[in-house]
């Protein structure tokens, strides 16, 4: 056997070995996230922030089966821009992460998916309040900013403060007084801490339901 052939065989064995070793399998949400940084779209966010992008196929998985925090918004929304840094402050304080998805794009580009997500949210809604709004045709409308707190496939809480505000009436910077910022962060802190604890508990059990713990 010549030297070149022997080298090729050894390389093949090493490559095969690398594929069959005990590699950790990513969770549903972790495999769906990308490496983009949200501060490219949300200009008030620092580069080191607590958000990760969730692809379309991971959104329903997180809502129906996961444990985590899902932020729905879109960068053209001034209220979403103003909300994100406040949520980020709370997430960082709790060493937690939040998934981000721009559902607004799907309203025009993939209405079937948009409607399905709206239905999913209400189907697992344990908050006691209706999260969705409805237009004159009876179609669900997801008003944003909206942050969902999901625990084992149930929406246990949400926050959508300012989702109905009109920036032509009041600007976000005028609305968000220091008192309102403090009240929001107090409310969010309790919920973020609860989800973080649930994620750790699931991880300790060998969580395989789409939860994410960093």
Region roles according to the model:
Residues 1-5:
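Positively charged n-region of N-terminal signal peptides that target proteins for export
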Residues 20-22:
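Bacterial signal peptide processing site
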Residues 48-67:
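A short beta-strand-turn-helix
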Residues 63-75, 87:
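Short active-site neighborhood of thiol/selenol oxidoreductases, capturing the structured segment around
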Residues 81-94:
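Typically the conserved alpha-helix immediately C-terminal to a functionally engaged Cys/Sec
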Residues 102-156:
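Thioredoxin-like thiol-disulfide oxidoreductase module
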């Amino acid at each position: 056997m010549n030297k070149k052939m022997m080298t090729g065989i050894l390389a093949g064995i090493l490559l095969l070995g690398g594929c069959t070793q005990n590699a950790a399998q990513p969770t549903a949400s972790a495999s769906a996230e990308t490496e983009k940084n949200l501060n490219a779209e949300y200009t008030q966010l620092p580069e080191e922030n607590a958000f990760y992008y969730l692809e379309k196929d991971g959104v329903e998985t997180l809502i129906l089966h996961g444990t985590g925090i899902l932020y729905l918004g879109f960068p053209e929304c001034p209220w979403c821009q103003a909300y994100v840094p406040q949520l980020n402050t709370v997430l960082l304080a709790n060493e937690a992460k939040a998934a981000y998805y721009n559902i607004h794009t799907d309203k025009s580009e993939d209405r079937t998916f948009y409607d399905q997500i709206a239905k999913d949210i209400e189907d697992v809604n344990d908050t006691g309040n209706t999260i969705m709004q409805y237009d004159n045709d009876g179609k669900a409308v997801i008003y944003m900013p909206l942050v969902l707190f999901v625990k084992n496939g149930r929406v246990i809480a949400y926050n959508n403060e300012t989702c109905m505000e009109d920036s032509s009436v009041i600007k976000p910077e005028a609305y968000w007084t220091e008192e309102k910022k403090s009240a929001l962060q107090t409310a969010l802190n309790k919920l973020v801490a609860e989800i973080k604890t649930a994620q750790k508990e699931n991880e300790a059990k060998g969580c395989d339901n789409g939860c994410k713990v960093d």
